[in-house]
């Protein structure tokens, strides 16, 4: 009986202290090839609406409060000439979100090459990777199994990874993907 009372009090105080703890600061790097929908996805999550976007030259940065996290999301342009600059955003990243255009089958080899390059970066060692398989609202979108196979994701053994099908335009799958990121960061 005494131990039950002690456990109840411990749980009570733990819950009280968590209220004052605040949100855990995290840094998320959002990258992907040009036209994948990175900015659309970011602003759909931030503003709850689809905004008109133009190709990102450089980066967009937004802070998003999600669950117990304060996520600073760096959305970096994906044009071929900009990709060498991605390395300048690696430092301090807690997670990488790689947005893929699920309808762009011709560029999956290029996506795989970029993901493989991320996996060998010292500054990203152990950093989890969420692959948003975007544009699932389109008829010719690749499903999750096709994305996993095309990118050979099952060969990744040194970190957590997850593929979340989504449609940035319709908000489908966005919150589920960020749930995975939040849960993974909290269990790290």
Swiss-Prot record:
**Pfam family for this entry, one:** Arf
> Which coarse location class applies to the principal site listed for this UniProt protein?
Golgi
One Gene Ontology BP term is: intracellular protein transport
Q: Write down the SUPFAM superfamilies for this protein, in alphabetical order.
A: P-loop containing nucleoside triphosphate hydrolases
Disulfide bonds listed in the record:
none
**Where is it localised?**
Golgi apparatus
Q: Name one GO molecular function term.
A: GTPase activity
Q: Which UniProt keywords apply?
A: ER-Golgi transport, Golgi apparatus, GTP-binding, Nucleotide-binding, Protein transport, Transport
- Please provide, in alphabetical order, the Gene Ontology terms of the cellular component aspect for this entry: cytoplasm; Golgi apparatus; plasma membrane
Gene3D superfamilies hit by this protein: P-loop containing nucleotide triphosphate hydrolases
Question: SMART domains this protein is in?
Answer: ARF, RAB, SAR
**InterPro entries attached to this UniProt entry:** P-loop_NTPase (IPR027417), Small_GTP-bd (IPR005225), Small_GTPase_ARF (IPR024156), Small_GTPase_ARF/SAR (IPR006689)
Task performed by this protein:
GTP-binding protein that may be involved in protein trafficking. May modulate vesicle budding and uncoating within the Golgi apparatus.
How is this protein named in the record?
Answer: ADP-ribosylation factor J
């Amino acid at each position: 009986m005494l131990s039950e009372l002690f456990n109840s009090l411990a749980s009570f105080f733990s819950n009280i202290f968590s209220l004052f703890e605040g949100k855990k600061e995290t840094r998320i790097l959002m990258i992907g090839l040009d036209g994948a929908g990175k900015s659309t996805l970011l602003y759909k999550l931030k503003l709850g609406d689809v905004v008109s976007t133009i190709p990102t030259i450089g980066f967009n940065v937004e802070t998003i409060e999600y669950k117990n996290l304060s996520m600073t999301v760096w959305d970096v342009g994906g044009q071929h000439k900009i990709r060498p600059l991605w390395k300048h955003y690696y430092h301090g990243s807690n997670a990488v979100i790689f947005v893929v255009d699920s309808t762009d089958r011709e560029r999956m080899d290029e996506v795989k090459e970029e993901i493989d390059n991320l996996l060998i970066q010292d500054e990203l060692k152990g950093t989890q990777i969420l692959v948003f398989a975007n544009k699932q609202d389109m008829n010719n979108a690749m499903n999750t199994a096709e994305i996993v196979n095309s990118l050979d994701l099952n060969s990744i053994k040194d970190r957590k990874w997850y593929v979340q099908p989504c449609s940035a335009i319709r908000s489908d799958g966005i919150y589920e993907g960020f749930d995975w990121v939040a849960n993974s960061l909290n269990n790290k």
